[in-house]
UniProtKB/Swiss-Prot annotation:
Enzyme Commission (EC) number: 7.4.2.8
Name of the featured protein: Protein translocase subunit SecA
Main enzyme class: translocase
InterPro entries assigned: Helicase_ATP-bd, P-loop_NTPase, SEC_C_motif, SecA, SecA_CS, SecA_DEAD, SecA_motor_DEAD, SecA_preprotein_X-link_dom
Manner of cofactor binding, per the entry note: May bind 1 zinc ion per subunit.
Membership in a protein family: Belongs to the SecA family.
Subcellular location: Cell inner membrane; Cytoplasm
Keywords: ATP-binding, Cell inner membrane, Cell membrane, Cytoplasm, Membrane, Metal-binding, Nucleotide-binding, Protein transport, Translocase, Translocation, Transport, Zinc
Disulfide bridge map: none
Primary role: Part of the Sec protein translocase complex. Interacts with the SecYEG preprotein conducting channel. Has a central role in coupling the hydrolysis of ATP to the transfer of proteins into and across the cell membrane, serving both as a receptor for the preprotein-SecB complex and as an ATP-driven molecular motor driving the stepwise translocation of polypeptide chains across the membrane.
Native source species: Salmonella paratyphi A (strain AKU_12601)
NCBIfam families: PRK12904.1, secA
Length: 901
């Protein structure tokens, strides 16, 4: 109450921010007459004037009023569009390292031109980040005339572009591209073998469109570049045959409940748990198939990989559904993005899950992959000097933006007041009743000439609604991952009178729905339209536009609630743009996933009390509140998962930064001989110390062991025992010096043969290759550590602290291995003539190119990472699922080391 009162008196933080910025808007408006007087050339010359002022030490911030006034005037001349005052406010918010919440239809694309131009003046580059290639291309081409008029270059960064084209795109003042492509380029740059192979510049300013989709929805999914591992496709096929024999039961066995099935599914945690009976049956079937020996346990350490295959196959059958989580196209399993409903071509699930789904669908199984490099979006975007974003719906996630990215959210007012009617939810008992009610609503609305947009959460649901509409004889368009090639065309005409459009998640569709359809799209469809044709198209559009306004604008139907209120708001936001009328309503049933998992008992209890009849709906504030609470629960759970992931990834991130900094320094220098000499000293000191402990008696020295080690690991034949016999005065220190001096001498002789330049080149190559190889192994080891670390909680230890401690120890060990491997490789190398070295380098490049083509870019869902390393030493004794776990945690085996992810 007190907070409300104080807000009324002093205004909220949002109001105060906008009040401060409105003063600058007045300044920009005051400059307008002055800018109008300038000729085109004088206006263009402003860019160089601003650049010169920045070079002399003026700050970018001090140029805001003038620079924004220049962009507004240029936009009037190039596009015939003048930035509204609210768009100027949005531009300032974006320059202020904040997130601008701007409603759909308020012109976010035009708003972005202001901070993009301003921040490009410093010459360090601006990255505009969009959710898909289509939008990156569209926005770049749409804004190119404006930026080029002002003397700015524009680049587009698309997947599959050759490196020179990418380098050119990044060298431009303003670069458009997708979040994935920027992230993958960063990883690829840190795998480059020469400075010329890198494409990105230093990361300066990122302007993220649909920022909630990129920084929140996709934050749980790391970007991964992986290379091929060993082939195990036959095993996936064999295990896949076994799974259909298993029967699912409703809930997990417990002291009070014993089911009849073989496994249970925890939908909330997306996990599958084998029952005691299931385990026995699987072991019998594995023995029958000849995969496992009789009397063996699936949980014995030797069967860890087999357990991994069984887990993956179970999850593929029980948790992943065709046309919801993936589609099968041209004999390939393609993932469907759960947030946007788009297909993710070339992406693969990790941990063998993709192969298990391929086996289930009977398509060709592709090899498993090994991680070569990975980063989360959270850590990638935090590398930018300056970060800002815009979206139609950020306010519900303001806390997360602030706590993780240190970004404040500012709600920018709309240019015209919003008059859309958001009707209360209707809840039905069954899915069929709900679909029927939706069809009736569509019939009623289209009879009045009102266009309808139906939002569904999966391809499967969109096809169910489509079939029912076809039965009812209602013409409609379907927009889902299967047909998104003609997506923009469908969206552009979704505002036609009585048009019906079904769409999977509308997040990130990026095209406004114009009431009466898009006359621009009709003009674009004609080859060489005359003035009369254009005038006629506009006149026809005006008639349709007025008819749709009279019918009540665009009506939105949601077929079920999403996990996040934000995505519901995005769907609603497609209607009522720029002060247009519109309406929206969500239809729900007790069979919807969200209701079933999170809100079922309470709401179905209410419905029974109210004595519902088939076909009847409940419309009550209590129900709406219960649903909002369910969504809040899911949102906070997802936030916790993302925060947890980030805390763990921060550990890896510090190491990644250290390795990448070291690697880039290596790339940028041509001579690493000083480094090599320094680490050679360290390596020989540590090697000698292992056999001749410092300050020890001669009886404790293992001279033969040292000679053997020097021969095997460094290819050095040294008669140390003979030296000691002949020269009694040789002591520990002088012996060390002699061994080191001899090793340097042998190395210098090799250098004389091939020449110093070739040797420097070779040293650098060895260091880079060794670093990459060890980093790859380190990433795999970190993955294993991460999967089993939660079990430390049973020993009253904080898993996060343990993870930090152990991963640091592993990192330190990796750096020691790096030194040892580099010196060992350089010592063992057989010297050849320069021509042969050149040929070997050529061979290495060809091999690198071949591997690059085999690399997979994936955007793996980390929630689904397989848990619990099953290396518990269970011995020969078979452990019951409900027995105490032998690790001593006090938990049941099935809930500890016997737990299936």
């Amino acid at each position: 109450m007190l907070i409300k009162l104080l807000t009324k008196v002093f205004g909220s933080r949002n109001d105060r921010t906008l009040r401060r910025m409105r003063k600058a808007v007045s300044l920009i408006n005051a400059m307008e007459p002055e800018m109008e007087k300038l000729s085109d050339d004088e206006l263009k010359a402003k860019t160089n004037e601003f650049r010169a002022r920045i070079e002399k030490g003026e700050s970018v911030e001090s140029l805001i009023p003038e620079a924004f006034a220049v962009v507004r005037e240029a936009s009037k001349r190039v596009f015939g569009m003048r930035h509204f005052d609210v768009q100027l406010l949005g531009g300032m918010v974006l320059n202020d390292r904040c997130i601008a919440e701007m409603r759909t239809g308020e012109g976010k694309t035009l708003t972005a031109t202001l901070p993009a131009y301003l921040n490009a003046l410093s010459g360090k580059g601006v990255h505009v980040v969009t959710v898909n290639d289509y939008l990156a291309q569209r926005d770049a081409e749409n804004n190119r005339p404006l930026f080029e008029f002002l003397g700015m270059s524009v680049g587009i960064n698309l997947p599959g572009m050759p490196a020179p084209a990418k380098r050119e795109a990044y060298a431009a003042d303003i670069t458009y591209g997708t979040n994935n492509e920027y992230g993958f380029d960063y990883l690829r740059d840190n795998m480059a073998f020469s400075p010329e192979e890198r494409v990105q510049r230093k990361l300066h300013y990122a302007l993220v469109d649909e920022v909630d989709s990129i920084l929140i929805d996709e934050a749980r999914t790391p970007l991964i570049i992986s290379g091929p591992a060993e082939d195990s496709s036959e095993m996936y096929k064999k295990v896949n045959k076994i799974i259909p024999h298993l029967i699912r039961q409703e809930k997990e066995d417990s002291d009070t409940f014993q089911g009849e099935g073989h496994f249970s599914v925890d939908e909330k945690a997306r996990q599958v748990n084998l029952t005691e009976r299931g385990l026995v049956l699987i072991e019998e079937l594995l023995v029958q198939e000849g995969i496992m020996d009789e009397g063996e346990s699936l949980y014995s350490p030797g069967n860890i990989m087999l357990m991994h295959h069984v887990t993956a196959a179970l999850r593929a059958h029980a948790l992943f559904t065709r046309d919801v989580d993936y589609i099968v196209k041209d004999g390939e399993v393609i993932i469907v993005d759960e947030h946007t409903g788009r297909t993710m071509q070339g992406r693969r699930w990790s941990d063998g899950l993709h192969q298990a789904v391929e086996a289930k669908e009977g398509v060709e199984i592709q090899n498993e992959n090994q991680t070569l490099a990975s980063i989360t979006f959270q850590n990638y975007f935090r590398l930018y000097e300056k970060l800002a974003g815009m979206t139609g719906t950020a306010d519900t996630e303001a806390f997360e933006f602030s706590s993780i990215y240190k970004l404040d959210t500012v709600v920018v007012p709309t240019n015209r007041p919003m008059i859309r009617k958001d009707l209360p939810d209707l809840v039905y008992m069954t899915e069929a009743e709900k679909i029927q009610a939706i069809i009736e609503d569509i019939k009623e609305r289209t009879a009045n000439g009102q266009p309808v947009l139906v939002g569904t959460i999966s391809i499967e649901k969109s096809e169910v609604v489509s079939r029912e509409l076809t039965k009812a004889g209602i013409k409609h368009n379907v927009l889902n991952a299967k047909f998104h090639a003609n997506e923009a065309g469908i969206v552009a005409q979704a505002g036609y009178p009585a048009a019906v459009t079904i769409a999977t998640n509308m997040a990130g569709r990026g095209t406004d729905i114009m009431l009466g359809g898009s006359w621009q799209a009709e003009v674009a469809a004609l080859e060489a339209p005359t003035e009369e044709q254009i005038a006629q198209i506009k006149a026809d559009w005006q008639v349709r536009h007025d008819a749709v306004l009279a019918a009540g604008g665009l009506h939105i139907i949601g077929t079920e609630r999403h996990e996040s209120r934000r995505i519901d708001n995005q769907l609603r936001g497609r209607s009522g743009r720029q002060g247009d009328p519109g309406s929206s309503r969500f239809y729900l049933s007790m069979e919807d996933a969200l209701m079933r998992i999170f809100a079922s008992d309470r709401v179905s209890g209410m419905m029974r009390k109210l004595g519902m009849k088939p076909g009847e709906a409940i419309e009550h504030p209590w129900v709406t509140k219960a649903i909002a609470n369910a969504q809040r629960k899911v949102e906070s759970r997802n936030f916790d998962i993302r925060k947890q992931l980030l805390e763990y990834d921060d550990v890896a991130n510090d190491q990644r930064r250290a390795i990448y900094t070291q690697r880039n320094e290596l790339l940028d220098v041509s001579d690493v001989s000083d480094t090599i000499n320094s680490i050679r000293e360290d390596v020989f000191k540590a090697t000698i110390d292992a056999y001749i402990p410092p300050q020890s008696l001669e009886e404790m020295w293992d001279i033969l062991g040292l000679q053997e080690r020097l021969k095997n690991d460094f290819d050095l034949e040294m008669p140390i025992a003979e030296w000691l016999d002949k020269e009694p005065e040789l002591h520990e220190e002088t012996l060390r010096e002699r061994i080191l001096a001899q090793s340097i001498e042998v190395y210098q002789r090799k250098e004389e043969v091939v020449g110093a330049e070739m040797m420097r080149h070779f040293e650098k190559g060895v260091m880079l290759q060794t670093l990459d190889s060890l980093w790859k192994e380190h990433l795999a080891a970190m993955d294993y550590l991460r999967q089993g670390i939660h079990l430390r909680g049973y020993a009253q230890k904080d898993p996060k602290q343990e993870y930090k401690r152990e991963s640091f120890a592993m990192f330190a060990a990796m750096l020691e291995s790096l030194k040892y491997e580099v010196i060992s490789t350089l010592s063992k190398v057989q010297v050849r003539m320069p021509e042969e070295v050149e040929a070997m380098e050529m061979q290495r490049r060809e091999e690198a190119e071949r591997l690059a083509q085999m690399q997979q870019l994936s955007h793996q869902d980390d929630d689904a990472a397989v848990a619990a390393d099953l290396a518990a030493q269970t011995g020969e004794r078979k452990i019951g699922r409900n027995d105490p776990c032998p690790c001593g945690s006090g938990k049941k085996y099935k809930q500890c080391h016997g737990r299936l992810s």
